[in-house]
Design a protein with these regions (language model features):
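Flexible, glycine-rich surface segments
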Residues: 161-255
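Sec-exported extracytoplasmic/periplasmic mature domains
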Residues: 55-63, 150, 154-157, 271, ...
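Start-of-domain marker
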Residues: 24-92, 103-105
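A cross-kingdom marker for long, charged
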Residues: 30, 215-305
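Bacterial Sec-dependent N-terminal signal peptides
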Residues: 1-26
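Acidic/His-rich structured neighborhood in mature extracellular/periplasmic domains
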Residues: 87-203
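Soluble non-cytosolic domains of exported or imported proteins
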Residues: 41-49, 139-144, 257
């Protein structure tokens, strides 16, 4: 009897531990390699293994010390398109990271951030074990994935508490610095590369000039979208306040990757929310949106009618 009780207690403890240490993410990695089909350097089976590796790495790693219930996992999509394989095991392409969050008291899921990475290159061989050490650059692919994971944590945590993502800003910044010094892909990690590359994304998020943007995310989501069902007027006020904040940030740092990527993700949502506003609020929203997101001026024109 004592043995049975002990076994039951051990099983219960194991189950409890599994629940408590549930991983943070529900990442879905989609790998498109259609442009590589037929290449002697590309084996379809290795592509399947690569996609599995990326999903497992992102979903099974422990990224925080916090407790996540299954329904609290952060939903992310990583859409990767491989366009070149200059040598066996070497791949080049682009990636799109999409971070989502549920809106309280609704069935609506909002996109927190969309980031397009045009300098996605790495080495992968199914027979080679990839190692990750956050304090020592090891391999390109796990470092890219860890960087993305921390970017996702920044936006998710900032949306639930003011500057809640700060610990992950520092982690992503450290990863980027290590990669910048060691990676062969300078276009992705170096300050002299593309102005929307990984260096500039985390530079923005780490800059004091962007603190109002990060603080505003809490107001936009937690005090705005999350109360839309009960108080849509408050939601519109918070959204307009955040747009004003973004305008002030953009004056200090024009054409930044954070602001541009924000509008890539939010234009539909912003228009939908502000279409219910009063005429004066609509005019203010249109003036800001058409100025900060000029390629979609015609799209926002409905607010000016």
């Amino acid at each position: 009897m004592k043995k049975k009780i002990l076994i039951l207690l051990l099983l219960a403890a194991a189950g409890f531990q599994s629940h408590v240490f549930a991983q943070e993410f529900q990442f879905m990695v989609n790998l498109n390699y259609d442009q590589l089909v037929g290449s002697q350097k590309t084996d379809p089976q290795s592509m399947t293994q690569l996609q599995t590796y990326m999903n497992d790495f992102l979903n099974n790693q422990r990224w925080t010390s916090d407790v996540f219930k299954k329904e609290e996992k952060i939903k992310c999509k990583l859409n990767i398109s491989l366009t070149r394989s200059p040598a066996v095991g070497n791949y080049e392409g682009n990636a799109q990271l999409v971070i989502s969050r549920p809106v309280f008291n609704s069935n609506y899921e909002t996109v927190l951030f969309t980031y397009v990475d045009k300098n996605f290159s790495f080495t992968y061989l199914p027979t080679t074990q990839l190692y990750f050490n956050e304090n020592n650059y090891t391999e390109e692919l796990p470092y890219i994935l860890a960087y993305y994971a921390n970017i996702a944590l920044i936006f998710d945590y900032d949306s639930f508490s003011k500057l809640g993502g700060t610990p992950y800003v520092q982690k992503a910044f450290n990863l980027a610095n290590l990669a910048r010094n060691s990676s062969a892909n300078k276009r992705a990690w170096d300050s002299n590369g593309d102005s929307r590359n990984r260096y500039w994304l985390i530079e923005n998020l780490n800059s004091p000039q962007f603190l109002p943007f990060r603080e505003g995310m809490y107001s936009y989501y937690r005090q705005g979208l999350d109360v839309a069902t009960q108080n849509p007027v408050t939601t519109r006020t918070k959204v307009l306040d955040f747009l004003t904040t973004i305008k002030e940030v953009a004056q200090l740092r024009p054409n930044s990757v954070v602001v541009n990527s924000f509008f890539d993700a939010k234009s539909d949502e912003l228009l939908r929310i502000m279409m219910e506003a009063n005429p004066e609020e609509k005019r203010k929203a249109y003036a800001i949106l058409s100025n900060l997101d000029p390629t979609k001026t015609q799209f926002y024109q409905k607010l000016a009618m």
